[in-house]
Amino acid sequence: MNNTEFHELVDAKLQLLEDMIDDSGADIEPIITGNVLTLEFENRSQIVINKQEPMHEIWLASKSGGFHFAYTDEKWTCSKTGVEFIEMVKEECQKHADEVIQWA
């Protein structure tokens, strides 16, 4: 994968994530600054997601720790847990929000 393909794939995944957050009605504020997407919660906790172009990875930092996602078999998978990116974000959002989020 070249850098252009990497950015296209990540941008599409992050847009999907933002749409899912909007559709959920959860009190989560997505803030984009450069290559970083910060999800801020009502309790002021944050999940930070960023593009790591040199490694072609997505990195996620939350109160559960740091996670790296690589694109294999047409999905972003965590190198530590094997969990798919969107599933991990959903789990972490519920931990940060301290409530069940109704994902569409």
From Swiss-Prot:
<dbReference type="GO" id="GO:0016226">
    <property type="term" value="P:iron-sulfur cluster assembly"/>
</dbReference>
<dbReference type="InterPro" id="IPR047584">
    <property type="entry name" value="CyaY"/>
</dbReference>
<keyword id="KW-0479">Metal-binding</keyword>
<comment type="similarity">
    <text>Belongs to the frataxin family.</text>
</comment>
<dbReference type="GO" id="GO:0008198">
    <property type="term" value="F:ferrous iron binding"/>
</dbReference>
<protein>
    <recommendedName>
        <fullName>Iron-sulfur cluster assembly protein CyaY</fullName>
    </recommendedName>
</protein>
<dbReference type="InterPro" id="IPR020895">
    <property type="entry name" value="Frataxin_CS"/>
</dbReference>
<dbReference type="InterPro" id="IPR036524">
    <property type="entry name" value="Frataxin/CyaY_sf"/>
</dbReference>
<comment type="function">
    <text>Involved in iron-sulfur (Fe-S) cluster assembly. May act as a regulator of Fe-S biogenesis.</text>
</comment>
<dbReference type="Pfam" id="PF01491">
    <property type="entry name" value="Frataxin_Cyay"/>
</dbReference>
<keyword id="KW-0408">Iron</keyword>
<dbReference type="InterPro" id="IPR002908">
    <property type="entry name" value="Frataxin/CyaY"/>
</dbReference>
<dbReference type="GO" id="GO:0008199">
    <property type="term" value="F:ferric iron binding"/>
</dbReference>
<dbReference type="GO" id="GO:0005829">
    <property type="term" value="C:cytosol"/>
</dbReference>
